Amino acid sequence: MKWTFENGIPIYLQILGRLRTEIASGAYPPGAKLPAVRELALEAGVNPNTMQRAFAELERDGLVYTQRTSGRFVTEDAEVLKNLRKTLSEDVIEEMCTRLMHLGMSREEILSAVQEWAGQASGKA
């Protein structure tokens, strides 16, 4: 997938966000080996030190671990992954609700719209 970066947000934070999303979505499943820092940095067009900083944050957060000679791997801790998905989903919901409230919608209208969407989405499945 192509890497694009926004101005005004540190690149390592954007990388971190993307990697967290890919881990949460299962693009990198539990126990999966992550690409090497240099490989991902080259793919993203960033300095390897920038990519390393994002990887260090993932490791600090317990989302990945390093095996000395084998590389970095996604945690297999189901609770950590569940918490990651919860946090990311809460962020998306907060952003969506904030944007809808700026459009003048009340909390009740937002809830009603989400329930309506969920009903339509379940009918498509």
Question: Where in the sequence are the language-model features?
Answer:
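Extreme N-terminal segment that seeds HTH/winged-HTH DNA-binding domains in transcriptional regulators
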Residues: 1-33, 39, 83, 87-91, ...
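Short hinge/loop at the helix->beta-strand junction immediately C-terminal to the helix-turn-helix recognition helix
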Residues: 27-28, 57, 62-63
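A short alpha-helical element within helix-turn-helix/winged-helix DNA-binding domains
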Residues: 33-44, 58
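Short, Lys/Arg-rich nucleic-acid/phosphate-binding segment
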Residues: 34, 66-74, 78-79
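Short secondary-structure transition/capping segments
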Residues: 44, 78-79, 120-123
